[in-house]
Amino acid sequence: MELNIRRLEESDYETLVKWWDWWPGWEAPPKTLLPDTGFIVEKNNVGIVSAYVYMTNSKTAIFDWVVSNPEYRESDRKNAIRLLIQATETVLRDQGIKHIFSFVRHKNLLKIHEDLGWDIDKKPSHEIIKNL
């Protein structure tokens, strides 16, 4: 079967929380931290990988909170990640976005971004958040 991508729905959050909780060192972000826009790649109605997109008041978007289904181990997993990134790029480009930021920890995800032409800062910065 073919990989498909669709917009995230509110009902997907519970599934994504299970994925985040499975991965060591990760904690699901609270729903109040997430934007309304996001995408998920599926095959045969099984979610593989998803991400959220924050829109800004400039020509910039933030591609973040990438998480994958830990139980999905088929050979097209990397292709699903590539599809997620490339489809998001296309949607954002069509909306007039000129720049996309992403925050990446996992070395394989970083490599996929690099292979797709993203500029990788060689001096990583820290993610800082304050809950009010």
Model-based region annotation:
Residues 101-111:
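Conserved beta-strand-loop-alpha-helix junction that forms the acyl-donor binding cleft
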Residues 111-118:
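Conserved active-site tyrosine of GNAT-family acetyltransferases
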Residues 74-90:
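Conserved acetyl-CoA-binding loop-helix of GNAT-fold acetyltransferases
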